[in-house]
Amino acid sequence: MMEIRPAEISDILKQQIATFDTPVDIAETGTILSVGDGIARVYGLQNVQAGEMVEFPGSGQRGMALNLENDNVGVVIFGDDADMREGDTVSRTGAVVEVPTGKALLGRVVDGLGNPIDGKGPLVGDVVMKRADVKAPGIMPRQSVGEPMQTGIKAIDALVPIGRGQRELIIGDRQTGKTAILIDTIVAQKSVNALGDDKKSLYCIYVAIGQKRSTVAQLVRTLEETGAMEYSIVVAATASDPAPMQYLAPYAACAMGEYFRDNGMHALIVYDDLSKQAVAYRQMSLLLRRPPGREAYPGDVFYLHSRLLERAAKMSDEYGAGSLTALPVIETQAGDVSAYIPTNVISITDGQVFLETDLFYRGIRPAVNVGGSVSRVGSAAQIKAMKQVAGKIKLELAQYREMAAFSQFASDLDPATQKQLARGARLVELLKQPETSPLAVEEQVCVLFAGTRGFIDAVPVDKVSSYERQLLAELHTGGKEILESIRTERQITKDNETRLTDFLTSFGRQFAG
């Protein structure tokens, strides 16, 4: 046995004391009282904030504190609660729910918390973490909407124009082409994004809430095939994801859009659809034992959507002049727009595009009900050339619908009425458009000019679509300078009008021959 001299003992003790360091980890923890249906009741966590992220070390899951009560905290779980047990530990993170934002997300598919789910590995590039649920900009940092956001769809750009920074509701029954309008709008931004100018580009964010995974996969494939995925982000909280993820996904995606808005860029966010977010929120609220209101929705379901949609804005020049445009979708039951959630969202947004089942089945696609659709921004969101041709269309279509209803009962019609009916039928045909074939604004102007100035009056109704196709092909070969002039001058000048009239006259003879 080694002998230690008394003189050395004090040295050894000093060395031991000098190296003695026990790491202490101080964390506020709580205990699960009960868990089930994606909700955990937690005892403890006295200082937790509302909306704070909490961790369940035992199962590796995370959750968000929503109900702060006297003796416990109601936590919604962002995952499967199967591995959680009564008595398990819960710890605070001290941070409110944050999501990654920035250009690194472009071209990626992420979940409601911003984690990539497309199998392409982690996010690469500059990522900025932002709070998912933030206050909307006030009154002074905003300016009125005055810059067009081209959807590439004639019926919308001409009749219910949407501006950058606007909130336009897409509302209709299931299977009426709501998602098709959203995809077309995203695809239509390809030409403006190809310019590579951040002040003009429009980055797109598609939020899938409560949809089938196969539907989301098909949508991503469509965006990839059309080359639109490179300037888009897809945020997916599918039907198999827990209700808290479906509730959070729109806010997380909105934070991603706000990154572009607040850095002087432009973004478009589409929520498909907010009816399912309201259902997920209702489920969470009822399980948290919050008092139910109309249709069993909680009392703050209006605030759920208003605080989300108010974050879409056109910022003033002092704040970078960026914008975030929102296209929320609401699914109606049997065309009932007077139900609770539809009326809420209609009152929050700056107008709505109303899609009708009857029109869809009659082959009028996009099935836009022109009478029921409105844009509260109006012609401020159109270039002058579009105003010049679109002004008459709405009136002519309204008169046509009225005449068509009366003409069913009348046997002999005067020539003026017959002419109006003929023109209206051709305009309805002209506003039809196949999926994923958006038109540039100058192409739309030329087509609508032909419709409103009587150049298609002699064309048989069933030949209108082929007339349009051939006209566009002809314009791209023999009328390039007309298109270029409308694109750069953004109006139909006297000189342009003469050239376009001559072009359409000669094309009409060629088409008839």
From Swiss-Prot:
Any one GO MF annotation of this record: proton-transporting ATP synthase activity, rotational mechanism
InterPro entries with a match to the protein in the record: ATP_synth_asu-like_sf, ATP_synth_asu_C, ATP_synth_asu_C_sf, ATP_synth_F1_a_nt-bd_dom, ATP_synth_F1_asu, ATPase_a/bsu_AS, ATPase_F1/V1/A1_a/bsu_N, ATPase_F1/V1/A1_a/bsu_N_sf
GO terms for cellular component: plasma membrane; proton-transporting ATP synthase complex
EC numbers for this chain: 7.1.2.2
Listed SUPFAM superfamilies: C-terminal domain of alpha and beta subunits of F1 ATP synthase, N-terminal domain of alpha and beta subunits of F1 ATP synthase, P-loop containing nucleoside triphosphate hydrolases
Keywords assigned: ATP synthesis, ATP-binding, Cell inner membrane, Cell membrane, CF(1), Hydrogen ion transport, Ion transport, Membrane, Nucleotide-binding, Translocase, Transport
Catalysed conversion reaction: ATP + H2O + 4 H(+)(in) = ADP + phosphate + 5 H(+)(out)
Subunit structure: F-type ATPases have 2 components, CF(1) - the catalytic core - and CF(0) - the membrane proton channel. CF(1) has five subunits: alpha(3), beta(3), gamma(1), delta(1), epsilon(1). CF(0) has three main subunits: a(1), b(2) and c(9-12). The alpha and beta chains form an alternating ring which encloses part of the gamma chain. CF(1) is attached to CF(0) by a central stalk formed by the gamma and epsilon chains, while a peripheral stalk is formed by the delta and b chains.
Similarity comment: family membership: Belongs to the ATPase alpha/beta chains family.
Record function comment: Produces ATP from ADP in the presence of a proton gradient across the membrane. The alpha chain is a regulatory subunit.
The name this protein goes by in its record: ATP synthase subunit alpha
Record organism: Gluconacetobacter diazotrophicus (strain ATCC 49037 / DSM 5601 / CCUG 37298 / CIP 103539 / LMG 7603 / PAl5)
Upper taxonomic lineage: Bacteria, Pseudomonadati, Pseudomonadota, Alphaproteobacteria, Acetobacterales
